[in-house]
């Protein structure tokens, strides 16, 4: 039925040049702009600054089509500027994003909607009307411009991120009365990417969040309907943005409740307009390379039709060529292991020194295994240590005691004892190895991610009695990397999350003290993981409350062990670069 509607031929002259490239297309028939207000214009700040600009000549909102890609991939991206609904100011980033997308085969078009905010109406009303009309016109032009009517993506910044979210969640709610047959065309997007979305929470519906978006009464705005046409999303936000990142986490949570694939990327210490420098390469941070994450999301969703076959991670990092010296040592002195139990394995450390050392930092890594087993040769450990050795970093791998202890001890007690002692051992030997005892990080996956949270948040808590002078050395760390941590929330304390970790009463378990030595963290989690990514999100939110800025990335459609087999060009394939970007940003690897 949709395709039949798209064949309707319109008599308006403004629709006659749809097949041309690079032209400007007015949104409305002359005299039919809904809720027209003479004080509003439709122009970018670049246009407004041009000599001879006349407001009265710029009242018609419009689409601006970019030159078509040389090889189309069958999808279209509609780009939406921010500006507080007061202007359209993001034209520079619109142009940069359009160039990147065009190079990848996307047909690109930008929307310039009416600003400033309308009088007597919600601040978003004019933009929403123009946005719904714009999506209809884009869909109408699909056949002639060479893309699929059901492959229309939306990307917007700030207020444009708010408008992107509106269009992505509320297509079944009309923003205006129909003016012609164009309005019979559906106005839903097929994928949405809100960048530092503004006005998402009730403590900041028209400006920055008055209570940081974290108050008990700060709720997600009810303007977002999350109807049956709600599309997959990737959300991006800076951790110190006054337009609170909690808006993005709440949108993400709602999408999870609806089982709609989604990603969220949160950047430590970044405010509104977090963009960095994409030319920094491997010296860059996560926010420098945010557009790469957008492209990876599109690839993971197969929006470009080019999702390839998964590749085994171990085959990609099969060599120890970057490793120099290797050393293995037990964690406990003979006969002095705390709470020793005969059914458990013997814990040990392995030092992996790089051939060419480029940093004095040390990364401790260990695997998961449900506290039933663990192995430093598994895919959760070996590829990462090889990757970091290639970067010039010293890595220490740990085998902790498993299976779970008996006799009433918690599932993690033995492993926590081993980790605290391991950190002390590494710190005690760092200076001798010409490494920095105050630049030590820990990293674990799954149950090892739970153990990482223990080590990162609870170093002031004693896991065991002192048996020697090593116990006098602090066991805090400077950073932590939690990869799909398990057992984080109360609805999944001993297994997968029964409620998906989504409800408010699915709280962080009491295992984690979040004491005063808690360190910054990086979280990476599959969106489709049964050990819910909401555990990572809620821990990130708790760290933010404490003023501890951290990075977080979730990966659409990816489950537990997302990295084991991943398609090139996706976030599950490049995930280890997030570790290096985090260390770059925090300067731990210098």
Predicted feature residues:
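Short beta-strand/loop motif that positions the catalytic acidic residue
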Residues: 235-237, 523-525
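Short beta-strand element of the alpha/beta-hydrolase
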Residues: 74-82, 360-368
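Alpha/beta-hydrolase active-site loop
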Residues: 122-143, 289-292, 410-431, 575-577
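Short amphipathic alpha-helix adjacent to the substrate-entry channel of hydrolases
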Residues: 91-109, 377-396
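Primarily recognizes the serine-hydrolase "nucleophile elbow" in alpha/beta-hydrolase
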Residues: 133-228, 421-507, 513-516
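C-terminal catalytic histidine-bearing segment of alpha/beta-hydrolase fold enzymes
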Residues: 249-312, 537-590
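N-terminal cap/lid segment of alpha/beta-hydrolase-fold proteins
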Residues: 22-71, 312-357
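Conserved alpha/beta-hydrolase "acid-adjacent" motif
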Residues: 242-248, 530-536
